[in-house]
């Protein structure tokens, strides 16, 4: 029931805004509808593995953060996101074993996650014309900034 889902989504956004908690969004197929709600609740939003050309600029203009998923090397839509999103609001993710298995079209072992993240980082370096080392530094800063906590290393 979309009416119930919409009402609950709005309640969650209001709760997160009230208590200043970031919101992680999986928007696949509901990008336009979610955007309308987000405009009413100022907050920190992280858009998980966005791959839609439509409304990308609107999400950027709202100050949203974005993750780039493991399909980056093969998916032009995700490459477009990696090219357009401000570098200081981007994070890299694997989205877990099943997502990596889906992207790779084969069974992926947990020990491969590091290599998959590195491959995505190299692709972002290429797309953004930035050194891998500089990008690593930026991703650490981004993560610290988004969660509001410094890492002890």
Locate predicted features.
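Divalent metal-binding pocket/active-site signature
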Residues: 1-62, 73, 80, 129-130
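Short, acidic/turn-prone active-site loops that include or flank metal/cofactor-
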Residues: 50-51, 70-75, 95-98
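Short amphipathic alpha-helices and their capping/turn segments at secondary-structure boundaries
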Residues: 77-87
